[in-house]
From Swiss-Prot:
Molecular functions (GO terms): ATP binding; phosphoribosylaminoimidazolesuccinocarboxamide synthase activity
SUPFAM superfamilies: SAICAR synthase-like (SSF56104)
One Pfam family, short name: SAICAR_synt
Record-linked HAMAP family: SAICAR_synth (MF_00137)
Principal EC category: ligase
Name this polypeptide is given: Phosphoribosylaminoimidazole-succinocarboxamide synthase
GO BP term (any one): 'de novo' IMP biosynthetic process
Enzyme Commission numbers on file: 6.3.2.6
Keywords: ATP-binding, Ligase, Nucleotide-binding, Purine biosynthesis
Organism: Helicobacter hepaticus (strain ATCC 51449 / 3B1)
Record-stated family: Belongs to the SAICAR synthetase family.
Recorded catalytic activity of this chain's protein: 5-amino-1-(5-phospho-D-ribosyl)imidazole-4-carboxylate + L-aspartate + ATP = (2S)-2-[5-amino-1-(5-phospho-beta-D-ribosyl)imidazole-4-carboxamido]succinate + ADP + phosphate + 2 H(+)
Pathway: Purine metabolism; IMP biosynthesis via de novo pathway; 5-amino-1-(5-phospho-D-ribosyl)imidazole-4-carboxamide from 5-amino-1-(5-phospho-D-ribosyl)imidazole-4-carboxylate: step 1/2
Amino acid sequence: MEKREMLYEGKGKKLFATDDEHIVIAEFKDDLTAFNAEKKGKESGKGELNCQISSVLFELLARHNIATHYIKRLNMSDMLCKKVTIIPIEVVVRNIATGSLTKRLGISDGSILSQTLVEFYYKDDALGDPLINDEHCKILGIIKEQSQLEILKSQARQINEILKAFFDEKGLRLVDFKLEFGQDSAGNIILADEISPDSCRLWDKQTNQKLDKDRFRENLGSVKVAYEEVLRRILV
């Protein structure tokens, strides 16, 4: 598969065209961003770790019949993916209260939620990725049919159950995570983007040590060392 011109560059990845119009290559970057890119950094090797972790988790989901854009990992930093049209919604799934949820609702940090919470955020950096509901999605023209929103919610909950059980076996708590979905050439809604410590909050079950991008957000030390530990555990 030939890697051709760059189609898009985001905060954590670059997308490249290939000799197949329906397939792209995602190249994972070493860049670190937080607070809507107000805080920026870089750590060598971070992109390769995210690529490897995402590949393991996409393959896990495939074994549970979850449709994703993932085809295969090409090398340490490149992933072959189906080309999709991204739905501009960040689907956030929360199992434990932390971050913005505690500030917004006054819930104690680290509290286990009585039920899984699924939230939608409008993907727009200029607006600060605001929290939105089903009606907002329709008014904005992001989603036209309620059935499509129900697919996003249902898929998010299924993915949560699979990942939560998997990470639990590896001694990790899946606190919360962000998903992005897209539509393939046939119009099917499938999981896209990545699943990594950049997009998931992962805490050690015994110590509650943070092994995710909060290490960068909160100046807790090396991101790479934490991501290496996550990769080590999920490969066991």
